[in-house]
Amino acid sequence: MNTIAKTTWLAFLLGFSALASAGHHEGVMHDGRDIKHIGYSQMGDPAAVLTVETEASHALRPGEVRVKVLASPINPSDLLQIAGKYGVDPVLPARPGSEGVGRVTEVSDDVKALSVGQLVLLASGNTWAEELVAPAAGFLPLPDLGPVGADVIEQLAMAAVNPLTALLMLTSYADVAEGQWIAQSVANSAVGGYVI
């Protein structure tokens, strides 16, 4: 695996572990607002088990940032996990969503890597929500793109899971050198498109 692939995969894993705990803030003071997220307490047909839930928004702890979720796609893997058919079962109750894009709205005083107004990729976990509060390491900063429209936001929301899957497939599971040919099935899938 090349250095870029290792770094990207490590950032993805760090984001997953940081965001996996997002929303669990026992003993942290309420900041006066309520936020909505999607949740489920049993696995099954997503149409039957998903609910819109409301919880208190919490004040930031050291090292945390608040991110307004701008878009989060519905991936087949999300639906399979909700249905209990993914191979890895979540701890229930759970919050779905494996990727997305958001804008930083608040940072704790000790966070220097992210700033208010910055666009970030939601690396993984709990992304079907209005906002996320989690350690800064759980978000991948994007460069300043200037003003962006909804079409760009929608594309950015899908920039973590499938591109990284394609990258890892080409760098970790095959020894493909520049100029070599590969054969691929399901080339019209999202992962297939990134491989091409």
Named regions from a protein language model:
Residues 22-30:
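Cleaved targeting-peptide boundary
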Residues 148-159:
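Short pre-catalytic strand/loop immediately N-terminal to key active-site residues, enriched for Gly-Thr
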Residues 56-73, 83-127:
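Glycine-rich beta-strand-centered segment in the early N-terminal region that forms part
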Residues 15-21:
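N-terminal signal peptide c-region/cleavage motif recognized by signal peptidases
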Residues 124-138:
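A structural motif shared across PLP-dependent enzymes of the aminotransferase-like
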Residues 1-9:
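Bacterial N-terminal signal peptides that target proteins for export
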Residues 160-196:
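Mid-domain Rossmann-like dinucleotide-binding core that forms the NAD(H)/NADP(H) cofactor-binding site
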